[in-house]
Amino acid sequence: MDDQPTPQHTRPEGVSDETVEAVGKLSAALDHIEDARGHLYAFHRLMGSAESTLEEATELVRDAGHTDLADALDRDALGANPLPGMWSFQMVDEFDDGFYARAKGLHQRAVDELMGGRRHVFEAEMKELRRTRDGREGHEATPAEVTDDPEYDG
């Protein structure tokens, strides 16, 4: 074991601390955007479930003899856009094709132009500062150091 990070997680020659920090912060921002995108997808899935459940509820209300309320549910809720002109799938499409695509593209540009295509250099350097180098389990530099160990049973 050479106990070193892999080359794709090391700082390219001549890259400043400030640049590593800036790209690390940009990566953190993209992480938040990815989380927001996940919540948007969760919203989309919940709205789909809500639509199906609302359809069932409308029929049950109708079957229970409450035609006026069932008609109002049919007219004013079932199939209605949660936002003007859009169902949740359209919100996802707009987000993915708009802001998300631009943010992801700009992040990739920063990684390519400023870090020579190397991702997570800021985090890799943080790991190197914090981990021990005494062979302690759980402090290996790379997964290969674990999977190459004869005692590894994964």
Place the predicted regions along the sequence by residue:
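C-terminal-biased regions
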Residues: M1-R62, T67-G154
